């Protein structure tokens, strides 16, 4: 009996030493796969149905339309108008992809298109808008990112539909694409315009 317990003991010790490593690897793999499978656009915004943040942001200096400085973000600008608020940056690759779609949206005068320039250098932001055209009637500069936090932004680009009463009715996480523009964003805009 003592021979069996002696021979089983090293195997048991080895197993007990390897068990935490196996558990760690298993948890790491589970975390990795779950992390990659999440869709951030499915995370509901706590701001839906609530008033848009009372955020005042300075204009992007030097950005002009018809030889007039494009105004910054003023909370009063949302009252009585349906607005599409896009949080963007020149360093954001998906922002470059969605820029032509925003330019097309900017032609629709039934609503105002507002831009929040997030943690960007002014020269780069102006160059970005010069390259694609400025679709925004207002561009507020959020140099430190605090205003975007108030809007519930955790990455760029993000787009919000704000109703006439100044309440957020929809939030799109990620870039505007032809698919989500047609299937989600435009229907949300039409609903807000009624």
UniProtKB/Swiss-Prot annotation:
Residue span(s) of domain Thioredoxin: 46-190
SUPFAM superfamilies: Thioredoxin-like
PROSITE patterns: THIOREDOXIN_1, THIOREDOXIN_2
InterPro entries attached to this UniProt entry: Periplasmic_diS_OxRdtase_DsbE, Redoxin, Thioredoxin-like_sf, Thioredoxin_CS, Thioredoxin_domain, Thioredoxin_ResA/DsbE_sf
Swiss-Prot/TrEMBL keywords: Cytochrome c-type biogenesis, Disulfide bond, Periplasm, Redox-active center, Signal
Family affiliation: Belongs to the thioredoxin family. DsbE subfamily.
Function: Required for disulfide bond formation in some periplasmic proteins. Also acts as a disulfide oxidoreductase in cytochromes c biogenesis. The cysteines of apocytochromes c must be in the reduced state for covalent linkage between the two moieties to occur.
Protein name: Thiol:disulfide interchange protein CycY
Species per Swiss-Prot/TrEMBL record: Bradyrhizobium diazoefficiens (strain JCM 10833 / BCRC 13528 / IAM 13628 / NBRC 14792 / USDA 110)
Encoding gene per record: cycY
């Amino acid at each position: 009996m003592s021979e069996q317990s002696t021979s089983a003991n090293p195997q048991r010790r080895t197993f007990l030493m390897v068990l935490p490593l196996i558990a760690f690897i298993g948890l790491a793999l589970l975390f990795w796969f779950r992390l990659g499978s999440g869709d951030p656009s499915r995370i509901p915004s706590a701001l839906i149905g609530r008033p848009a943040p009372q955020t005042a942001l300075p204009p992007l200096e030097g950005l002009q339309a018809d030889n007039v400085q494009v105004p910054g973000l003023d909370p009063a600008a949302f009252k009585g108008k349906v607005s599409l608020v896009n949080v963007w940056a020149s360093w954001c690759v998906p922002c470059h992809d969605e820029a032509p779609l925003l330019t097309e949206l900017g032609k629709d005068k039934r609503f105002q298109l507002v831009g929040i320039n997030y943690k960007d250098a002014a020269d780069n932001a102006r160059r970005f808008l010069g390259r694609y055209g400025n679709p925004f009637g207002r561009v507020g500069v959020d140099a430190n990112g605090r205003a975007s936090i108030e809007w519930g932004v955790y990455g760029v680009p993000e787009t919000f539909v704000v109703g006439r009463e100044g309440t957020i009715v929809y939030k799109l996480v990620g870039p505007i694409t032809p698919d989500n523009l047609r299937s989600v964003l435009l229907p949300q805009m039409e609903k807000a315009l009624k």
